[in-house]
Amino acid sequence: MTTHIPLPEWTDLIAAVLSLPPDEDALSKSWRGQDNAAIWYSRGSWVLAAVAKQLAQSKTASPLKFWIPDYFCNQSTVALREVGAKLVFYPIGEDLVPDWQRCDAMAKEEQPDIFLAVHYFGRPMDMARARQFCDSHEALL
């Protein structure tokens, strides 16, 4: 059989089975604070749920309002729903940029606790504008 993909050598397979797992502390050392610990998750949605759960424990009002763009994978919200976060879907335009005027109007009715910024298809969101929105509505970004 001819493949276009390079096949591993037997030594690569043996090393993969017998090698020790990487040191998680060493892997995270370059980006975590000196006195901080790193927590590893297998899915980004579990991270969102952990953040929501932690923040919900520290605030008095409930439920936690987690703002997510209205074009977002539903499967990624399952863990957030399980921890009791209230999902508020904020409007984005055809250019996949938040409609900031409508977001400001929505925030007057229901202030966000967490605002999830999404970089669609490799295009970075205007994070300065997102930070401005979050600062004016006392939300985490």
Across the structure, where does each feature detected by a protein language model lie?
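Conserved PLP-binding active-site segment in aminotransferase class I/II-type PLP enzymes
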Residues: 1-61, 83
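Hydrophobic anchor at the start of a short beta-strand
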Residues: 38, 87, 141
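Short beta->alpha linker loops
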Residues: 42-43, 71-72, 121-122
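Short, well-ordered alpha-helical microsegments
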Residues: 48-49, 74-77, 124-127
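Residue-level signal for well-ordered alpha-helical scaffold segments within enzymatic catalytic domains
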Residues: 50-53, 78, 119, 132
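Conserved PLP-anchoring active-site segment centered on the Schiff-base-forming lysine
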Residues: 52-110
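Active-site phosphate-binding strand-loop segment of PLP-dependent enzymes
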Residues: 94-141
